Amino acid sequence: MQPAIQAEGLVKRFGRNTALGGIDLTAEEGTVLGMLGPNGAGKTTAVRLLLGLISPDAGRVRVLGRDPRTADARTRIGAMLQVARVPEALLVREHLDLFSSYYPRPLALAEVIHRAGLEDIVNRRFGELSGGQKQRALFALAICGDPDLVFLDEPTVGMDLHSRRQVWEEIRRLAAAGKSVLLTTHYLEEADKLAHRIVVIDEGRLLRAGTPEEIKRAVSGRRIRCVTRLDPDLVRRLPSVISVQRDRDATVVFAESPEQVVRSMLGEDDSLHGLEVSAAPLEEAFLALTGGNAART
């Protein structure tokens, strides 16, 4: 079975800026690949390369075993991008009819409307919709052709909780039907719940790839939280420490060997208290891997 996505050594430069510095990506058929990274990490560039919208300066891309720029590949791909420009004067129903015409075997209109939850807006003009409603309509356009591979770039931004969970169920349904999904998201809970594998990208480099559990273990899955008078810079210099953050009055440490770190901290501060050692949630693992750049996410 060939991978749905196979990219090797992807490099893309814009002038002197290297947006991608030679990354490899693989997504198997019937799986959801989650792509995480701060703004400016290279996620959008990677998606555009995989869709064949731009060409790499080096490396090779295949989707469904084909060059993504070919007509054969494009009739088997659906995409929902962050920046989508569609005529605002058309009704949502008219957009669905138009996009469905691009595919050889599109889904029935009634099925698309139901799966994307468009019953209340299908006869409204696109320009009249709220941000969350537009996202639902764009999701419908991505799946209306019954594609084998779907690119979803921040699909649930602006949606209410009910709509977000409805899209989650549809993503699960796509994978269960043997479709493949590449999902970029700022909602780390979304990646944790939906993705079979996750890749973490920052500054054009692939930092880590694995299952959600493997990503959590990549920061040694160990999160130390305590109240200490030790300076965070001192804690950062201790062996096996990956990152140190402040959480109100507490210090939060990610470490490969938590026992060693706790012993060292107790040796320096016998007043240390409120000690907790636990597995790292995906959000905190992500922040640790990307250097805690929360402001960039």
Where are these regions (language model features)?
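Residue-level preference for beta-strand/loop junctions
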Residues: 2-3, 220
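ABC transporter nucleotide-binding domains
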Residues: 3-7, 12-202, 208
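A broad structural signal for alpha-helix termini and local helix breaks/kinks
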Residues: 14, 100-103, 116, 219, ...
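An acidic, carboxylate-rich microenvironment
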Residues: 58, 72, 94, 111, ...
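Short, charged/small-residue-rich alpha-helical element at the C-terminal edge
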Residues: 221-297
